[in-house]
């Protein structure tokens, strides 16, 4: 549902931030 899409988007954003910090 919509909530799952929102959680997925938030997870992708968090992963991108983490990758940015590690690199």
UniProtKB/Swiss-Prot annotation:
Its main location: secreted. Expressed by the skin parotoid and/or rostral glands. One of its GO terms (cellular component) is extracellular region. Keywords: Amphibian defense peptide, Antibiotic, Antimicrobial, Secreted. It is found in: Secreted. Antibacterial peptide, that adopts an alpha helical conformation which can disrupt bacterial membranes. Each caerin displays a different antimicrobial specificity. Belongs to the frog skin active peptide (FSAP) family. Caerin subfamily. This is Caerin-4.3. It comes from Ranoidea caerulea. The lineage of its organism: Eukaryota, Metazoa, Chordata, Craniata, Vertebrata.
């Amino acid at each position: 549902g919509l909530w799952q899409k929102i959680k997925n988007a938030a997870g992708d954003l968090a992963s991108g931030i983490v990758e940015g910090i590690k690199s």
